[in-house]
């Protein structure tokens, strides 16, 4: 009986330790379960290392796989994804999940192909600095009543969206062989009252019900909006509406683009927060700061050195690990572009976000540093079940060092997370750590933190059969169980590393590289010490263990490509590669290891497969010459693109046409929409009648053109108030004569002006006031007074000096809510004449009557022009060369400029506001091998006129790539069709 009990307990320990885990489930599936330590997928614990990705902000589906491969290569095993209602629904009852980037099935397929799980976040409200927070724009005009409550009017609008998108999510759940493991309900919705009948509780119940109706069975989650409330946790005042996995969002950096000494203050109360409010659940951060957005008039992302610094992930993400977080999602990991009119007014065209992966899809040092954490968590299974042993400044020989001490109760593995107690400190501090190990108390010597640096020191760390690291002052990057157990350490150059292997006698070893290893004896065995030299050092021990000692720069170029497509990668399911810029994947076939990747410059490559049958290395399909090292790796050279000359065409053959013919008094607007409403569903009353809110007439995104008529020569002016978002300007003309307006302000959503008609020619009858308005997006929910319902367009227009307007008409994007360009979608275009006529689309034939002027010539007064040109590119097929357009304007220029590449609005340039003047285009929007149609619209906000002084194509980095960036993108670039009905 005792033997049976022992075997039973042993089996139970295996099932609940490193093997299969039984945890709490939601009663719908056991494929995804949880306990207070971590999430488990298919019975195996998982450290969820996730990155936020918004497919809408990269409208080329093929490039989603490019991004996913880069995330997987850099240690991620999941993506978190918003699904924006606004992107898929141009009008009520219509949903597009088929055309171009609207085909989200491809998103799930690519995620699965890349080996990434998916956390689905379909709202219905998302926020995300996107227009109206992701609400369909046709609904964001007041008709939903009290949004984000149980209001019946709101329910009737959002329910069809969640049902439709939910069915696709359900189809792709892990229970159906797909990648979806979690499904978020709503977004940052603070539970204000713990009352089962409260409207928010009822609303969350409604969301759960509709998702269930759609077929969702994976666990539900939610994201708390910082430490401001406690919402929807089953462990705290659960009166209904609670989700399975509680999450806490946090953006603690407080960093400044212009002041490198500001912020950098760690939050060290996450652990207590989760213990208080979600103690039976794993600690989950659905959004942790991966960067920060920048507003109109702010800084451009490339200048934000503090946000871009690799110090940030090193210190902040490791602090989260020390706080026992085991579900960690970085917002953003790839930001992308607010192309078209998809941005909320708080951001400009770029949504780079200072994220680890640049808007151009280039890998920043920030991502390289993040990879070191991702690869560590991927193999460190003991980290998935720990308790907080303690924390504070008493663990080291220097009280300026703060320590988190985590312990695995089953294996005794220890994880000590170290950082300066004052997290913003830049001191170089050397100290020893008082650690608890299976060999007793050990003082681990010569640990150095170089300013804003953090380290995870491990003890009793198993890295394979009969291989345990008793301790190490060098950080573990990863390990592999191949023909031998391979352990990978990293340190800064010049820092000291000391480690000991558990239960091992003094081992003979051979060193290959610049780091000299010495030994010393102690009560717990042999201690191996070294000072990290430059580059890579390999140490081969007589017991078979192979250790790589990497400096940080070498670690940044170290990869562990999996040989499995599963997001869960065991230590025997990856190989080790050092050297290139990117390793996308690897496989072993018939004695050859085949590696795909990218390289900027020619580099060496070292490959360790642990397979003696592997004699050759192929890089992007081509065999490279290699030599075998004494410790079993293969070393060769892979080519880069440093010698490639990128020759971009000059843009000197332009045609121009008038894009504001509506300012002329005899313009025929008889087919325009008549503004005749005297009431609005919007809760905000207009300042005058008729209602001139653009949304009330079916025009939502982009430029709007209004024409108001009045009689009499005695009218002295007009008082006009326009609200189209922060920085949005407007201009007005009377009978074709400039009358004034506003250049907009980054701090104002609405601007007013008293237009003076003195000196302007008026008629007895039928004078025309033309008002052209820019647009920077619909507000998010948090903006007063009514969030997404804050109207767009003219809030009020009255005449001074007597009389009233006799009529108003409005024109916006061609077709309004008809979505006449379903590939590019409902937010791509506005109401400028050139847009309505499709002058920006490929295949448009410019008439001979067009002038041969360019944006450098500009306009001399308050006018508008639409400039078009074509050019060809012929980049090498194996190159990834991000291309952008650099604009500039003379100081003092006040104008609204838009950039269209092959029909996509990929730039909104306000030279008087900034900050953005460089606009990148992803392949698929631009043709790297073929013809391109470039259009620029420009209208002056004052009678001083406007012109540009720089319009040139620029190349970013150059990379030899194993990814096909030069495909036929024709299906994403539908061409011109006659649009004369929208004049």
Swiss-Prot record:
Leader sequence segment: 1-23
Source species, domain of life: Eukaryota
Binding-site residues for substrate, renumbered to this chain: 82, 127-129, 187, 251, 353
MF (Gene Ontology): beta-galactosidase activity
Subcellular location: Secreted
Cysteines engaged in disulfide bonds, as pairs: 257-304
Catalytic activity from the UniProt record: Hydrolysis of terminal non-reducing beta-D-galactose residues in beta-D-galactosides
Classification via Gene3D superfamilies: Beta-galactosidase, domain 2, Beta-galactosidase, domain 3, Galactose-binding domain-like, Glycosidases
SMART domains, sorted: BetaGal_dom2
Glycosylation sites: 197, 276, 391, 434, 466, 516, 601, 676, 714, 719, 804
UniProt EC number: 3.2.1.23
Active site: 188, 287
Annotated protein name in UniProt: Probable beta-galactosidase C
Family: Belongs to the glycosyl hydrolase 35 family.
EC top class, as a word: hydrolase
Purpose: Cleaves beta-linked terminal galactosyl residues from gangliosides, glycoproteins, and glycosaminoglycans.
One GO cellular component, as annotated: extracellular region
Organism annotation: Neosartorya fischeri (strain ATCC 1020 / DSM 3700 / CBS 544.65 / FGSC A1164 / JCM 1740 / NRRL 181 / WB 181)
UniProt cross-references to InterPro entries, sorted A to Z: Betagal_dom2, Betagal_dom2_sf, BetaGal_dom3, BetaGal_dom3_sf, BetaGal_jelly_roll_dom, Galactose-bd-like_sf, Gly_Hdrlase_35_cat, Glycoside_Hdrlase_35
Keywords noted in UniProt: Carbohydrate metabolism, Disulfide bond, Glycoprotein, Glycosidase, Hydrolase, Polysaccharide degradation, Secreted, Signal
